[in-house]
Amino acid sequence: MAVPKKRTSKSKKKSRRSHWINKAKTRIRNFLNLAKSISNKKATSFAYSTIKN
């Protein structure tokens, strides 16, 4: 027999959403820092070609 599921509380919903948003913010921050270091050619994990055509 099918039983309806319990409803998720607002606090749990907010907690999950804020956790997801914080994870997204940290990934965006890391991406921007990497982009800045690449644009300034200070990144050590990338090889740059110095030959211009």
Swiss-Prot record:
GO cellular component assignments: chloroplast; large ribosomal subunit
The keyword Ribonucleoprotein is assigned to this record: yes
UniProt entry keywords in alphabetical sequence: Chloroplast, Plastid, Ribonucleoprotein, Ribosomal protein
Primary localization class, coarse: plastid
Record GO terms (molecular function): structural constituent of ribosome
Cross-referenced SUPFAM superfamilies: Zn-binding ribosomal proteins
Chain spans, region Disordered: 1-21
Cellular localisation: Plastid, Chloroplast
A single BP term in Gene Ontology: translation
InterPro entries assigned: Ribosomal_bL32, Ribosomal_zn-bd
Family (UniProt): Belongs to the bacterial ribosomal protein bL32 family.
HAMAP family in UniProt: Ribosomal_bL32
Entry protein name: Large ribosomal subunit protein bL32c
The species this protein was found in: Cyanidium caldarium (Red alga)
Gene that encodes it: rpl32
